[in-house]
């Protein structure tokens, strides 16, 4: 299980209003890009990937940018590679570059023409400089994160009621962006675990909780019953602390606290 879109559920949702499929590479796990591409070609649809979690990860020797019609990256401060705030769109068609340059600049085409409804989505020079500085450290950042993930696995593999991330897919080069743990059958529920860790000044995250349909601004748009796997994960997952400079003794302490929960 990698928490990404189930390609077998896509075709039943396609209508005459559908113009694109927007899958999410979750926690740095790649979607089933081959199946999604086949479905998109069959129905003449575009594929736009949410690649926010995947900078530095690869599938079959290629980055997420190599798949789909476009991939959208986040350079938020919490990501493996960041510019404090910002992001990027990767694409293969040159016309997309022209369109995006206009859309990120209020829809302005030239001094006299505004063709599209756009916004102000430009990165500033400071953010760009920050990105250039960070870019040289990405490989080292990922390698350090790998050691953290391996330490978590050493401690937590075999603990009843914990579903841990798996890194054994030979086609996938992970970036270790997150360390998600699903609590199902553990001695305590996810929320109690979160509270216990927080009481010891350890801050995990209930990632994707609550679900979008539970937000006030989206209520009534769709039911959680339509996305049972997302609801299952949202109600049970914690992402444990994960960053390159996380000390091994801190990982040991986090895991020790988890194991002492009764």
What residues fall within each predicted segment?
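PLP-dependent aminotransferase class I/II
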Residues: 5-8, 12, 20-24, 29, ...
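Active-site phosphate-binding strand-loop segment of PLP-dependent enzymes
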Residues: 1-83, 88-90, 189
């Amino acid at each position: 299980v990698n928490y990404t879109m189930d390609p077998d559920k896509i075709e039943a949702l396609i209508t005459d209003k559908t113009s694109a499929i927007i899958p999410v590479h979750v926690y740095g796990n790649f979607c089933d890009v081959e199946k999604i591409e086949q479905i998109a070609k069959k129905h003449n649809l575009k594929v736009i990937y949410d690649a926010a979690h995947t900078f530095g990860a690869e599938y079959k020797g290629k980055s997420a940018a190599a798949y789909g019609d476009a991939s959208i990256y986040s350079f938020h401060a919490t990501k493996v590679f960041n510019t404090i705030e910002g992001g990027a769109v990767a694409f293969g068609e040159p016309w997309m570059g022209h369109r995006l340059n206009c859309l990120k600049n209020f829809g302005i085409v030239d001094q006299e023409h505004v063709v599209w409804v756009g916004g102000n989505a430009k990165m500033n020079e400071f953010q760009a400089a920050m990105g250039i500085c960070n870019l040289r450290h990405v490989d080292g950042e990922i390698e350090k994160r790998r050691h953290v993930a391996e330490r978590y696995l050493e401690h937590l593999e075999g603990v009843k009621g914990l579903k841990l991330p798996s890194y054994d897919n030979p086609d996938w080069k992970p970036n270790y962006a997150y360390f998600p743990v699903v609590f199902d059958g553990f001695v305590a529920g996810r929320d109690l675990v979160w509270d216990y860790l927080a009481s010891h000044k350890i801050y995990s995250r209930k990632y994707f909780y609550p679900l979008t349909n539970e937000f006030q601004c989206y209520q009534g748009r769709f039911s959680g019953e339509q996305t049972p796997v997302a609801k299952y994960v949202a109600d049970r997952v914690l992402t444990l602390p994960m960053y390159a400079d996380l000390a091994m003794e801190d990982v040991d302490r986090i895991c020790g606290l988890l194991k002492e929960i009764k």
